[in-house]
C-alpha cells in the first residue's frame, strides 16, 4: 500500500489506485482517525484529503467500504472496509519506524506509541465484531434441523467458540496478534480447529498457538 516513505513523502498504491502522500498531512493518523470514527458511528462518511502539493486525491471511508478517487476524476476505486484495514494495518506495522520519522521535529518513540494505540483502536473492535458476526452466522446455519447427538456436538463446539471469543475480549495480547487474527477469514473457526487437536485448556492453547505462530514468523 505505502512505499518510499521518506522525508515527508510516500507513494500509495492500492487496488490499482496510485497516489502520493505528502508532509502536508499525516496520512497514517488521518486514515486511522477516519476508520475509528466510522466504526463508532456507522452512519458516518469521512473523506480524507491527500495533497500532492498541487493535485489532490481522496479516501472516502464508511462503515462498509473505502473509495479512492481524484479531484479531477470522480471515478472511484472501491474496496471493502475489511480488506482495506487488513492491508493498511499490516503495512503500517511493518514500516512503523519509518512513519515515526514522518515529521522530524516529533519524538519517534512517542509517534510510534501513538500509531500503535490508534491501530489497536481500529483492529481490536473490528476483530471482536468480526468474531461476533462469525459466531452468529455459524449458529444460524448449524442449528437448523439438528436432532439428537448432532445437537450435542453443535452445542459442544458453540461452548468453546464462545469461550474463545470471551478470551479475545478479556485477555491483553499485543497489537501484532490482533492484526494477525483479523487477517483470518474465520478467526474463531481457525482457533477452534487448532484447539481440537491439542490436549489443553482453551486459554492455554490460544496463547501457545499464538506464541508458536510468532516463532515461525521469526524463523522465516
Across the structure, where does each feature detected by a protein language model lie?
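Long protein-protein interaction modules used by eukaryotic assembly/scaffold proteins
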Residues: 13, 58-140
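Acidic interaction surfaces
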Residues: 22, 26-29, 74, 136-220
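A generic secondary-structure boundary signal that marks alpha-helix termini
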Residues: 40-41, 97, 173
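N-terminal low-complexity, intrinsically disordered segments
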Residues: 1-61, 65-75, 139-151
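Residues in intrinsically disordered, low-complexity segments of regulatory proteins
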Residues: 8, 56, 98-101, 137, ...
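Generic solvent-exposed, charged/amphipathic alpha-helical segments
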Residues: 32-36, 89, 93, 161, ...
Amino acid at each position: 500500500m505505502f512505499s518510499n516513505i521518506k522525508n515527508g513523502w510516500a507513494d500509495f498504491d492500492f487496488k490499482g489506485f496510485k497516489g502520493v502522500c505528502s508532509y502536508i498531512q499525516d496520512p497514517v493518523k488521518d486514515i486511522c482517525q477516519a476508520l475509528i470514527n466510522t466504526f463508532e458511528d456507522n452512519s458516518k462518511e469521512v473523506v480524507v484529503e491527500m495533497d500532492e502539493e498541487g493535485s489532490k486525491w481522496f479516501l472516502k471511508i464508511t462503515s462498509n467500504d473505502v473509495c479512492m478517487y481524484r479531484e479531477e476524476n470522480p471515478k472511484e476505486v472501491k474496496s471493502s472496509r475489511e480488506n482495506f484495514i487488513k492491508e493498511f494495518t499490516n503495512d503500517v506495522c511493518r514500516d512503523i519506524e519509518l512513519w515515526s520519522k514522518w515529521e522530524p521535529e516529533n519524538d519517534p518513540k512517542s509517534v510510534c506509541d501513538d500509531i500503535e494505540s490508534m491501530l489497536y483502536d481500529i483492529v481490536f473492535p473490528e476483530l471482536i465484531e468480526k468474531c461476533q458476526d462469525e459466531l452468529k452466522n455459524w449458529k444460524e446455519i448449524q442449528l437448523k434441523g439438528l436432532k439428537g447427538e448432532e445437537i450435542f456436538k453443535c452445542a459442544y463446539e458453540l461452548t468453546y467458540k464462545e469461550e474463545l471469543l470471551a478470551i479475545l475480549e478479556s485477555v491483553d495480547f499485543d497489537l501484532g496478534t490482533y492484526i494477525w487474527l483479523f487477517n483470518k477469514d474465520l478467526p474463531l473457526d481457525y482457533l477452534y480447529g487448532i484447539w481440537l487437536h491439542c490436549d489443553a485448556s482453551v486459554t492455554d492453547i490460544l496463547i501457545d498457538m499464538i506464541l508458536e505462530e510468532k516463532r515461525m514468523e521469526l524463523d522465516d
